[in-house]
Swiss-Prot record:
GO terms for cellular component: cytoplasm; nucleus. Involved in resistance against the pathogen Phytophtora sojae. Inhibits hyphal growth of Phytophtora sojae. Possesses ribonuclease activity in vitro. Keywords: Pathogenesis-related protein, Plant defense. Belongs to the BetVI family. GO terms for molecular function: abscisic acid binding; protein phosphatase inhibitor activity; RNA nuclease activity; signaling receptor activity. SUPFAM superfamilies: Bet v1-like. This is Pathogenesis-related protein 10. Signal peptide: none annotated. GO terms for biological process: abscisic acid-activated signaling pathway; defense response to fungus.
Amino acid sequence: MGVVTQIYDTPAAVPPTRLFKAMTLDFHNLFPKLVDSIHSIVFTQGNGGPGTIKKITTIEGDKTKYVLHRVDAIDEANFVYNFSITEGTALADTLEKVSFESQLVEAPNGGSIRKVSVQFFTKGDATLSEEELTANKAKIQGLVKLVEGYLLANPDY
């Protein structure tokens, strides 16, 4: 098994408290409304704390896929949320799992910076192409920007 790590920051024009609520605490309610391909997010174990498992079901075209999202750590006071994608039909065959460590910090402009470390645990000698890594980074940063846009348009959320 190999491990490939990506580290990057994504700025957002909303404070950490609002972004953390939307991207972490209310993720299961908000993302199916914002992301067309997400059909549902269901708790299969736990209540949101470490050890909780959420089943995320997506529909793309005529294909239904899912992943299991396991909460590894959550620290509301410091805006930390760590989770792993551990299995599912939407997890690439070459991957054992994908782990995310994220923290929101306050930006000088009153917004946020989402600091993320992503670890891809590959099966056997499998590798990830630069295109796959670039696409993954764009997808994750795009989700932050999608939520940012929603929060800016809905200041009472």
